[in-house]
């Protein structure tokens, strides 16, 4: 429920106006700090997306309703400065299966027209890769396969959802940069042996 997510956001992030209860005991401050850290940890590690079933199918109505309700709650709870980050992270968690990128993702991105949401989608997708290992002097082959994957995503949406296409283009550029860097590292490793 978006209300539960907003509760975590309220505990993890200060309000837009910076207002905090001034008259609280030291133990209450310590409790709030612990709750803030725990809430932030939960939010940061959230790997699901609303409206997605156990098979990776997305219900567009549930997802859209959830996202827009989260925006309403952010106004009520004075957390409008962090809601884009959370929405971007949620949308970045959509399953990258055969139907990816889902049309609802493109629709929401185009409706919101938020550079901040777009950037947090990109960050979430990029960070979802995790740590990589590679063979000696392998170079940037892993990254180039990701460039090709994101190019295929971009090509699917480029005319209908230009903002989403831009996210995929930025991911392509980022992985191309890392591919070139890994090629350089491989050349150095090759010279050493």
Locate predicted features:
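Short, charged, amphipathic alpha-helical segments
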Residues: 164-174
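Inter-repeat boundary and helix-capping residues of tandem alpha-helical solenoids
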Residues: 136, 143-144, 161-162
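Residue at a conserved register position within TPR or TPR-like alpha-solenoid repeats
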Residues: 157-158, 175
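Amphipathic alpha-helical coiled-coil segments
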Residues: 175-189
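Short amphipathic alpha-helical heptad-repeat segments
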Residues: 139-151
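Non-catalytic all-alpha helical scaffold/repeat segments
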Residues: 1-129, 192
């Amino acid at each position: 429920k978006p209300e539960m997510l907003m509760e975590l956001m309220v505990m993890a992030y200060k309000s837009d106006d910076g207002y905090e209860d001034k008259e609280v005991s030291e133990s209450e401050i310590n409790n709030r700090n612990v709750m803030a850290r725990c809430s932030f940890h939960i939010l940061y590690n959230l790997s699901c997306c609303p409206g997605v079933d156990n098979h990776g199918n997305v219900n567009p109505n549930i997802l859209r309703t959830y996202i827009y309700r989260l925006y309403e709650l952010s106004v009520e709870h004075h957390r409008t400065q962090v809601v884009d980050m959370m929405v971007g992270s949620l949308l970045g968690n959509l399953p990258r299966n055969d139907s990816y990128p889902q049309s609802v993702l493109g629709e929401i991105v185009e409706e919101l027209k938020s550079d901040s949401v777009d950037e947090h989608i990109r960050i979430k997708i990029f960070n979802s890769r995790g740590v990589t290992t590679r063979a000696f002097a392998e170079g940037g082959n892993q990254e180039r396969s990701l460039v090709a994957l994101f190019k295929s995503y971009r090509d699917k949406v480029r005319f209908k959802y230009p903002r989403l296409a831009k996210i995929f283009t930025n991911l392509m550029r980022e992985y191309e940069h890392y591919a070139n860097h890994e090629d350089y590292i491989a050349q150095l490793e090759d010279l050493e042996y």
